[in-house]
Design a protein with these regions (language model features):
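Carboxylate-rich, polar loop motifs that coordinate divalent cations or form catalytic acidic clusters
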Residues: 1-174
């Protein structure tokens, strides 16, 4: 009797696993939806973007969407756009935004095409340029690592890591 109950238990598990394996493709196929099945909204200069080309998108922990365009940084709250550019944000040295990254602590890291890199923390903005140790002001991407160090990938001069106030350069020579 104990042997029969063990075999019965194993049989049920085997049948259950086989059923799951047979249903797996159906479950996966049920999740494939055409793009038209999803809600889609298009934003252009008509809705408030400063430029129709969006180069980067990030979402900060507080829910804002951050968009990088050739005419400035945009914060979107779901209803309206707020544009940050050289005219209203002197810390942004260039309107051409190539990269935007949102850090887990709420900081927003902004890489510009000719104005270095800027980090926004709350209402404070800080910009790094060549005079601050960047290898180049033409930034392709930038981010903060888990230790809070700023890493900046430049257009043609390698990578700069900011350890506090001390820049460390990584390029073809080192």
């Amino acid at each position: 009797m104990p042997m029969a109950s063990v075999q019965g238990w194993r049989g049920k598990v085997l049948v259950g696993l086989l059923a799951l394996l047979c249903l797996w493709p159906l479950m996966a196929a049920a999740q494939d939806k055409p793009l038209s099945a999803f809600y889609r909204e298009t934003w252009t200069t008509r809705q408030g973007l400063p430029h129709n080309q969006v180069n980067a998108i990030a979402q900060s922990p507080d829910g804002y969407l951050w968009l990088g365009t050739w005419e400035g940084l945009v914060r979107y709250n779901g209803l309206e756009f707020h544009v940050f550019d050289r005219a209203n944000t002197p810390e942004l040295k260039d309107n051409g935004i190539r990269s935007v990254r949102a850090a887990s602590d709420g900081a927003v890291v902004i890489g510009t095409s000719r104005g270095g890199v800027t980090v926004k923390r709350g209402d404070r903005w800080r910009t790094w340029m060549e005079k601050d140790g960047l290898a180049q002001e033409e930034v392709m991407d930038a981010l903060l690592d888990r230790q809070g160090r700023l890493w900046v990938a430049t257009e043609s001069a390698g990578i700069t890591r900011m350890d506090g106030e001390v820049p460390v350069q990584f390029n073809e020579r080192n």
